[in-house]
Amino acid sequence: MKNKLLLMIFMALFVSQSSANAQSISYPCSIVLEPVNEIPNISGTALITKIKKPYTDQPGSPARERTGVGVYADWMPMPSAFGDFDQYEGFAQIPSEISWRIKMYVVKEDQPSWFGGSPWVGKFDEISAELSAETIVSLRLSNSRTNRLGPAVLQSTLKGCVK
């Protein structure tokens, strides 16, 4: 009886560890951010990678590992086309745990696309939490005056990043 119980506990731990490893993210990883609604031409991508950041600016400073998320979106209409919004924000979240807002910047082009819209870029590289396949990365509307975050216009999960 005791041996059966130990065997069952060992098997449960092995299966639990195997499923946890099966869901680990392979870095670096890029995902395509898909339009949430039918908005012509918009497209985006996110690059998720591990980076080493020094603790200080001093030479030889020890480094700490963080996860960085970079977001690129193109052919984006002005945010005001969707209502009371004046910017886009990248947004990464582990559902029901934690989220990060990513400041986005419009890229001024020398020769804008005749399709319209503008590219927006941003990155955040201070994530210490372990990301999972269920992590959602999106580009959302935002109002800088009220700090109100609007709905997502592009979105995807990290499921395509699983080893």
List each model region and its residues.
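Bacterial N-terminal signal peptides
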Residues: 8-16
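N-terminal targeting/export leaders
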Residues: 20-163
